[in-house]
């Protein structure tokens, strides 16, 4: 409840100011408040209440009680002021709500339009994509159904769709999918009556080559003997040469060329080396009875650090001291040994460097010399 403001006036003689009048249940007294601000309405209402109170006091008897109309009219005027203020506040709130609702409606409508536009674009794109995918899938399925197998045909005319005789091209498929109706079983295939006839020609050629090699060896006077069948002095050397023949077949060819007689022409030697296969030479034994067995010291005397050219000793020089003589036409064998050279003292030669003193030119004055120094 709003506090009741009462304006006091000077006391009159024989009268008493009633600050708290008692309510009267008689005829209601209305005090209308004009529309306007709060303060103006309150001041207007209070002034009217005070005037009515004075009139009632003057009109009434001095001994009787004051009329309670003043309190009732004051309360009603206050209630009306409050109701008017409430209505104004409600109007302002309703106006604000309407403005915010309009703004929200506008923003929501614009957003809905944007969303609807985006959804329309997205829907159109997705529909176009789905339509293209379905078309391509249908074309692919129709292409697969037109051919029974995914493999290509051998002829290049299979892409010619205007060709009416497409069934003719179905006959030429890949080798993996050939028609098995024309296939022949392996059991019914024609077989060779004599398979050995195929291999007989190759075996005969091999025997002819073998005979030729034997004849060439016989012409060169190489006697095929048993292994290690030489004299007692050259047993070890013969065994070593036979082992070398088994491991590396190219070395005995060179030894045969050197040990054979020099009277035979060179063409026969070349024919022997080229015609005889390496696998056949391992079965032959070279007669090494005429080869001298010499010690390492006799062959290579005075070998300490390195070998000079004067120390290379030919085998023919040892022919006088040996008991077994070489044949007259035997070729000389020279042996050269490569060893690491010994350490040699290297003399350090001193290099003399001539130093010249720097001398200034004669034309330079003395003060410049001092600055430079």
UniProtKB/Swiss-Prot annotation:
InterPro entries reported for this sequence: Meikin
Organism: Homo sapiens
Predominant subcellular localization, coarse grouping: nucleus
GO biological process, one term: homologous chromosome segregation
Region (Required for localization to kinetochores) residue spans: 332-335
GO CC annotation: condensed chromosome, centromeric region; kinetochore
Organism placement in taxonomy: Eukaryota, Metazoa, Chordata, Craniata, Vertebrata
Cellular compartment(s): Chromosome, Centromere; Chromosome, Centromere, Kinetochore
Motif POLO box domain (PBD)-binding positions after renumbering to this chain: 275-277
Keyword terms: Centromere, Chromosome, Chromosome partition, Kinetochore, Meiosis
Known role: Key regulator of kinetochore function during meiosis I: required both for mono-orientation of kinetochores on sister chromosomes and protection of centromeric cohesin from separase-mediated cleavage. Acts by facilitating kinetochore mono-orientation during meiosis I, when kinetochores on sister chromosomes face the same direction and are thus captured and pulled by spindle fibers from the same pole. Also required to prevent cleavage of cohesin at centromeres during meiosis I, possibly by acting as a regulator of the shugoshin-dependent protection pathway.
Subunit description: Interacts with CENPC. Interacts with PLK1; required for recruitment of PLK1 at kinetochores.
Ranges where the record places region Disordered: 1-91, 250-276
Residue ranges with Basic and acidic residues bias: 77-91
ATP-binding among keywords: no
Protein name: Meiosis-specific kinetochore protein
Gene: MEIKIN
């Amino acid at each position: 409840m709003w506090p009741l403001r009462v304006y006091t006036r000077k006391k009159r003689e024989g009268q008493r100011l009633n600050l708290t009048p008692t309510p009267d249940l008689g005829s209601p007294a209305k005090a209308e408040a004009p529309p306007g601000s709060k303060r103006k309405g309150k001041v207007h209402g209070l002034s009217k209440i005070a005037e009515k109170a004075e009139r009632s006091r003057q009109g009434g008897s001095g001994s009787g009680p004051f009329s309670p109309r003043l309190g009732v009219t004051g309360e009603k005027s206050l209630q009306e002021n409050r109701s008017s203020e409430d209505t104004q506040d409600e109007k302002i709130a309703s106006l604000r709500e309407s403005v915010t609702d309009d703004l929200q409606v506008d923003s929501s409508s614009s957003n809905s339009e944007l969303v609807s536009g985006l959804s329309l674009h997205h829907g159109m794109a997705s529909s176009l994509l789905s339509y293209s995918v379905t078309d391509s899938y249908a074309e692919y399925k129709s292409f697969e159904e037109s051919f029974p197998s995914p493999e290509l045909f051998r002829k290049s005319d299979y892409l010619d769709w205007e060709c009416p005789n497409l069934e003719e091209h179905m006959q030429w498929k890949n080798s993996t999918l050939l028609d098995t109706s024309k296939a022949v079983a392996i059991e019914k295939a024609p077989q060779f009556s004599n398979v050995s006839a195929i291999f007989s020609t190759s075996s005969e050629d091999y025997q002819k080559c073998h005979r030729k090699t034997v004849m060439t060896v016989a012409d060169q006077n190489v006697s095929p003997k048993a292994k290690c069948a030489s004299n007692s002095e050259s047993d070890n050397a013969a065994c070593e040469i036979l082992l070398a023949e088994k491991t590396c077949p190219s070395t005995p060819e060179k030894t045969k060329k050197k040990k054979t007689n020099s009277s035979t022409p060179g063409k026969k030697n070349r024919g022997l080396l080229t015609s005889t296969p390496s696998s056949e030479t391992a079965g032959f034994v070279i007669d090494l009875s005429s080869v001298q067995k010499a010690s390492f010291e006799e062959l290579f005397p005075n070998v300490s650090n390195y070998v000079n050219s004067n120390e290379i000793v030919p085998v023919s020089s040892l022919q006088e001291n040996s008991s077994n003589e070489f044949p007259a036409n035997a070729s000389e064998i020279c042996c050269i040994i490569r060893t690491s050279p010994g350490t040699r003292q290297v003399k350090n030669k001193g290099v003399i460097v001539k130093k010249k003193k720097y001398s200034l030119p004669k034309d330079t004055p003395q003060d410049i010399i001092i600055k430079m120094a």
